[in-house]
Amino acid sequence: MSEAAVMPWRRRASEKSLAKEGRIWTLWSAGVIVTFSLPAALLIWVEPLAFPVAVIFVGHGIAVLHLQASRGARGVKPIGDPETGPERTALGLLGDLVGHETRELLQETGLALQRGRLGAWLVGQEGAILVRPGGHRVHCFCVRVAEGSDLPQADRVAHLLLALREDEEGFATVANRNFSGARWRLRLEVAKRVRPALRQV
């Protein structure tokens, strides 16, 4: 992927780098929990009647984790219902591109499924979800199509899908990761329409 060549400061994505990033995100999440839970526990120990305040404190920590997962969910925008001729044409061409096996999933969820060496990708208009082998961890990537916002929605997905097929590791290198964590955390934040896609991969 040519975009990866102009970003030499980014280490090329690989199985090893994705595993490392996953561990970093897990440590960060654990750090958030500890940061908010320890003072809450200390507060209860000092003054048991302060339990409601401690609960609010822990709630703030949980909210931070939800906000991070929500950010990942917002970065992957599914295709909406086609309203114009060009939109319907683009969706038809995208359906041919993904093949019969995943066309039904595309129509149902608005995301295109692409299986690769790094895992299963669910591609939307402005990014993609990578479900790692085993299905327990996901990485959310945000990436914009350079040609602009006047393209039909399905064309934007097609551009990202073709880039992913051309160079999977390059795609993961260029795209901006905005969440990594357990699949169930992301499933709580995505639109109901998208959830079947996460269940199927």
Describe each PLM feature range.
Residues 123:
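Phosphate-centric recognition/catalysis
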Residues 133-201:
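Cytosol-/stroma-facing membrane-proximal "stalk/adaptor" domains immediately downstream
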Residues 1-74:
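N-terminal alpha-helical membrane-insertion module
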Residues 61-119:
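N-terminal topogenic membrane-targeting module
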Residues 126-127:
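A short beta-strand signature
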Residues 11, 99, 154-155:
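Short amphipathic alpha-helical segments that mediate assembly, nucleic-acid/protein binding
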